[in-house]
Structures are given as C-alpha cells and as structure tokens.
Amino acid sequence: RNGCHLMMREGSAARNMPVLLKTVMENHLDTAMVSIVTDDLHTVDLQERGHLDDSLRTALGMGLDFVKAIQMVTVNCARAFNLDREIGGLAPGRRADINITTGPQDFRVLTTFAGGRQITDNGKLLVHYETAEHEPCVLNTMNLKNPITADSFKIHAPAGAKKVKALVMDTLPYMPFTNRRDVELPVVDGVVQCDVEQDVLYIALSLIHI
C-alpha cells in the first residue's frame, strides 16, 4: 500500500547514487519517491567533499532537473518519514531550518537558520553551545569481557594440516554487499594464515556490551 521509496546513498563506505540515479533518469521514473541521502560520512570526506551539497553537484552534473534534485534532498525524504508537516519545505507552521547557498554551481552554504534563528554567517558560528555533560550511566560502556590481543585473531587449523580450504567474503568497492569466494590458505604452526597475494585478510567483530 505504501509503495517503495528509493534512497540513493553517497556516503564514505557506500556510494551508489550515480548508478541508481542513471537508472532513474534513463527510465524516466517518477522522482517523488526517490531521495538522495549520505548514510555515514567520515569527517575527512565532510571536510573535503561536503555533504548533500556534494551529492547535488554530482546529480546536476549528470543532467538531473534542478527542481527535482532539490526535492530529492528535502521534501521527498521528509515525506518518506512522515515529517513533511515539520520539515522539507518552507511554509507557515513548519520548522524554519534553512540553508542559503551560493547556487547550483557549488551549493556553498552562506547562511544557516535553525528554528528561524540564524546560527551561521559565511561559515562562522554565531551562537555558543555548551559542552554536553553526560550521566555516568552512559560513560565507559565499551567493556570487553576479554582483552583483545594478537592471539585473539588466530584461527586454529585441524591437527597436522598444511593448508585449509576457506570460505571468505569478497567485498565490493563502495558497496554494502559481499560475494562468496572459496580459497586455499596456508597453515603455519597450526594457525591459518592470511594471504595478501589472494587479498585475504582477517576481519573480526567484537561485541562491546557483554
């Protein structure tokens, strides 16, 4: 009943907006249910590339209509989360969160308003924010049951094995998907070794709350 809302990510780890946008444009799809988002962005990328301004430059460079591009980073996403009565557009009764930019050439932010209050001017912060103080219960929560050492990453092979067959994840550049890859890895002193020549490295997930 609700249909499907497409969110095209252009972040640091996942970058698929240009590929998806090309498909949308080539097939003349209705963009009302399409948004441009960033997902996670590293601080270095924020500093060097920008945020949604960078995505807008990319989209317009691909030939996307200007109005549709603006809608994709504002009202479309607000509608997807049923927040369009508060944000996503300029209208009486809505939150006056506004960025004034230089225009479609580079979208450099000149002035920012939050809740109708001007908080930046030409990149300078006009308001003062106190450093947040946190309750003790939310501090020092990353407690590992067992300390992590180099030995934590050792994978022991069956006794007497010189090589083992292993199932590994084949990661794709800037895509949140993996492919299956079957490899044969060497064993040294009973421990399965990484193999740089095959681009096989260890990866581990450590639960921090147990």
Ranges and model annotations:
Residues 1-5:
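Hydrophobic, small-residue-rich alpha-helical packing segments that form membrane-like cores
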Residues 7-14, 30-50:
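Short acidic/histidine-rich active-site segments
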Residues 17:
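Active-site-adjacent beta->alpha loops and helix N-cap segments on the catalytic face
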Residues 20-28:
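Short amphipathic alpha-helices and their capping/turn segments at secondary-structure boundaries
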Residues 44-63, 67-208:
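Active-site microenvironment of metallo-dependent hydrolases
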